[in-house]
Amino acid sequence: MPVLKQLGPAQPKKRPDRGALSISAPLGDFRHTLHVGRGGDAFGDTSFLSRHGGGPPPEPRAPPAGAPRSPPPPAVPQSAAPSPADPLLSFHLDLGPSMLDAVLGVMDAARPEAAAAKPDAEPRPGTQPPQARCRPNADLELNDVIGL
């Protein structure tokens, strides 16, 4: 198996040093008061989170021992549709008008008899609707239409 050699300069480029003029001075419009670590742990001033509704919900307290128990709230039914936030569960391919027109044009070119006779909205009783056929030696190739 051949060994691939990386092409490039023999000497690696040296990164330029950052000078005092390349970093701007603090503008005074930002205060660093909070830090979030890699594990999600946060420390510092988190009071702004409570003003924006981003705080965690309060933990439920255990009722006193002598208090009667109330029935649990009804469960919220979950929809069977995938969440739009999960791109792996939904797949949507938009070819756009130009790509779709090109593909449909190639398919129509493969059926010259279909261009002459447009099918009715409903087929007549006792007749079969026309079947789509593709010829292997069509005049237009899909790669030519889309520019490959």
Swiss-Prot record:
Q: Which InterPro entries match?
A: Cdc42_effect-like, Cdc42_Effector_BORG/CEP, CRIB_dom
Region Disordered: start-end pairs:
1-89, 111-148
Record PTM Omega-N-methylarginine, positions in chain: 38
| Comp. bias (Low complexity) | 77-87
Which residues belong to the signal peptide in this entry? none
Membrane topology of the entry: Peripheral membrane protein
GO BP annotation list: JNK cascade; positive regulation of actin filament polymerization; positive regulation of pseudopodium assembly; regulation of cell shape; Rho protein signal transduction
Per the UniProt record, which residue ranges are transmembrane? none
Instruction: Write out the entry's keywords from A to Z.
Output: Cell shape, Cytoplasm, Cytoskeleton, Membrane, Methylation
Q: Where is the composition biased (Pro residues)?
A: 55-76
For this protein, the record's PROSITE patterns field holds: CRIB (PS50108)
* Highest rank taxon of the organism: Eukaryota
GO CC terms for this protein? cytoplasm; cytoskeleton; cytosol; endomembrane system; membrane; plasma membrane
Location in or out of the cell: Endomembrane system; Cytoplasm, Cytoskeleton
* Membrane keyword on record: yes
Q: How does it assemble?
A: Interacts with CDC42, in a GTP-dependent manner, and with SEPT7.
The record ties this protein, via PANTHER family, to: CDC42 EFFECTOR PROTEIN 5 (PTHR15344:SF15), CDC42 EFFECTOR PROTEIN BORG (PTHR15344)
Q: What does this protein do?
A: Probably involved in the organization of the actin cytoskeleton. May act downstream of CDC42 to induce actin filament assembly leading to cell shape changes. Induces pseudopodia formation in fibroblasts. Inhibits MAPK8 independently of CDC42 binding. Controls septin organization and this effect is negatively regulated by CDC42.
Comment on protein domains: The CRIB domain mediates interaction with CDC42.
Name of the protein in its database record: Cdc42 effector protein 5
Q: Give the species this sequence originates from.
A: Homo sapiens
